[in-house]
């Protein structure tokens, strides 16, 4: 499978209000990194064993919700857009009570 070339301008972004009350965009990964930094700081040295699932659920559920809205419930189209097979999509939708 060939990896698609991605234009940095097409990256997922988050709108942020800066100190000068201006709306700017920053990559989603920066927001995820900051959220993880905050979460880990709150742990105060404690270990956690489900961080991967926690983060995945925080991103995966809204992503599935939005893609299903975008495709108007067309699971085949949604699976193609996500780059997964339809069976996998159906399992994920069921996991989040969406299917």
UniProtKB/Swiss-Prot annotation:
Name listed for the protein in its UniProt record: DNA-binding protein Fis
Taxonomy, superkingdom: Bacteria
Residue ranges the UniProt entry marks as DNA-binding: 75-94
Stored Pfam families: HTH_8
Statement: the UniProt record of this protein carries the keyword DNA-binding: yes
Family: Belongs to the transcriptional regulatory Fis family.
Keywords linked to the UniProt accession: Activator, DNA-binding, Transcription, Transcription regulation
Function: Activates ribosomal RNA transcription. Plays a direct role in upstream activation of rRNA promoters.
Subunit organization: Homodimer.
Residues annotated as signal peptide: none
GO molecular function, one term: DNA-binding transcription factor activity
């Amino acid at each position: 499978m060939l990896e698609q070339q991605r234009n940095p301008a097409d990256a997922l972004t988050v709108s942020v209000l800066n100190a000068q009350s201006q709306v700017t965009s920053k990559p989603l990964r920066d927001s995820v990194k900051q959220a993880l930094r905050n979460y880990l700081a709150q742990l105060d040295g404690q270990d956690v064993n489900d961080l991967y699932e926690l983060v995945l659920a925080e991103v995966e559920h809204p992503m599935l919700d939005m893609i299903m809205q975008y495709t108007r419930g067309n699971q085949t189209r949604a699976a193609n857009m996500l780059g997964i097979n339809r069976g996998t999509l159906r399992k994920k939708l069921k996991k989040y009570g969406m299917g």
